[in-house]
Amino acid sequence: MTQLNRSLLAAASVFVFLTVLAPAAMPGQNRGPEKPLAAPSGALTVERVSAEPDADERARSLHWSPDGVRVAWLQLRQPPAKSRGEVPQQEIWAIPSDAPPNAPPAGPPREPILLVSAEKVTASLRGSDAPRHRRLDDDDDNSNPYLLRNFAWSRDHSSLLLIGAQSLAWFEIATGSSRTLVSGDQPLSDAAISPDGKTVSFIRDHTLTLVSVQSGAAARTLLPPAHEDILEGELDWPYRNEFHLARGYEWSPDSSRIAWLEIDDRAVAKYSLRSSNGESREIVSPKAGGEIPVVRIFVKRAGSGAEDSPVEIDLGPTKGLYLPRFTWLPDGRHLAIQRLNRRQQTLELILADAVTGKTQTMLTEKDQYWINISDDLRFLGDSKRFVWSSQRAGFRHLYLYDTDGKQLAQLTHGDWEVTHLNAIDESKGLVYFTATEKSPLESHLYSVHLDGSGMTRLTAMPGTHEAHIAPGVASFADFYSSQTTPTRLNIVSLDHPDQTAVAKTSSGFSAPGQSPPSLLPVEFLNLKLHLGAEAHAFLIKPPAFDSAKKYPVIVYLAGGPGEQLVRDAWGGATGLWMQLMARKGYIIFGLDNQGTAARGHYFEEPIHLRLGGQEMADQRDGVLYLNTLPYVDTMRLGVCGWGYGGFLVVHAMLDRPVPFKAGFAGAPVIDWHFYDAIFAERYLDDPVAHADGWDASTALENLSPTFFKGSLMVAQGTEDEVVHLENALTLQDRLLDAGKSADFLLFPDRGHVIEDPPSRLVLFSRMTDFFVKNL
């Protein structure tokens, strides 16, 4: 890569298309120091960074009790540092909310209690008949069949279903006793309790299986065995990871029927993942332009036998189509099914009769770019009206429809996004939702009447609120964080949201047993890009900052669809690593380019038919802004990112105008032909009809000996199911052909996210050392 000549650097300060509109700090957020900062107190080391949980780890596992009185979640307990052979185990913690549902809180907030200890979890999942000792080779989750994956409340909220990798146990809270429901050495997944609380369902051997809670009778399959590539109620990798479908089957509200998705992967391409011991396993990996799964939906009475025929829902020919969502209506007879064409530009919402299989289309959405699938569909109790979200006007908003497809009301309006439809309280005529109305950098809980009137914000603290509303819609669990506040859980009454929380965590959800260190302030910026769009960015400056000095800069990249780097939220381990590097004397800079989330569909559209182009143009504008700052050392620019961010890092290191000296790329996509069809075709369309866009989107477009002069390190898990190892190998092969090379940090048998503590420590240590050495 050629160095950006000094005349261009000098000219950058007069580029009128790149101006700072505001050093706009969030309300309550420090705008940045006017005089040098003292060094922050509190130890911040690589070990401390690697111990920090992912920012949303606890929120994913949260479950309200059916009576809406207690909320519980998983929390990982690490074994003592000097223990041998002991692996981490999940515990279940809970917060009781003893206040009457509609009463204001009184007295001090309630503190969390340990509901099920790690020892009890392990004993319950192991069962009396299983071996009590085994060899443990590492801390990877897959090596521990007794690790708690999830849990569910019983209908009477007196017990918990403990869900392991191979076993299910029924745990009685009052006595602390448990009994085994399902055991064995074969994996199981997607366990759930029927709405009437009498049956547990799960997937084993690619098919639906049921077991009685009371009798503990032998598990029975709802369907006969099928071909190993025909999944009955089980999700394949694309549907689980690209459409984020929670489960491949659903109980009817009265527990009389089960609807499931049949996924036929027989014609779909497979990819082989090879472990360090020479064993291999295949995963379904539909490639662009190739075959995609053939999907159908069936319904069957829960009490029927495997030999009884199910009802097939009449969706017409489904080859070349996706069915990304389906759900029951409250009446227990009808299903709502979303049908999406392969180009992902036409989405139909279909009403299906579960008894006859007949269907009718309720509404159709069309978009010339692509349609983003969401979970925003809730039916009212009469099963004749529903709330639905759409981005048809450029921003996602809520609409009230009837099942004949008539729009009854538009509930929300404005140049902001509804990010989640939380709940409907029909008794009050209120819809609860999460949105960016206050700022794209924040998210808050709101309510609005079913006629679209009286929109009210229910959360006050500046930052990010992720609300989980309780059954009965009396209170909500609020996962709150900001750039300087680790994630905390508060339980708040919906009738008194401005009052003190009725319950809260005492120390937040930071690393167990560790207080968060004091942090350097984050300055939020609004930058106007060269084509007129406005981008959000942030700066973190070193302690004792002196504007008369020159500082190196690390540009952190995320940049992909659905991602948002610049937001007032706790950043987890990555955010702490940025703080660590700032303490070491680096300025940290991040910018959300066009194509990222929370700014509306208009802001996403410029990446259509070309990935990496608009994103890098916007990131170059960010660098040009940095060049206007007198305290930035323009010859010492580094870049770092993971996944899509890693893809952009490789682009950046080969980008002709910008002289990045060092780049750290985690799991970078090198060629989108290697990626799964659902994601790649959504943005690039057909690889034959739009071959030029596909070719231009490769990270190696500008590779040549002339344009690669910096230091590049690539980190990759060898069993990464998202970004396959062939990407990293192709990059190194092409670099060698050009007479160049990159440093590679391989994590054997690890996936896309490096999760086990020893490997996380190595990852953050190598990232840190790489920039200290090369920048």
Identify the role of each PLM range:
Residues 269-270, 324, 332, 338, ...:
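Serine-hydrolase catalytic core recognition
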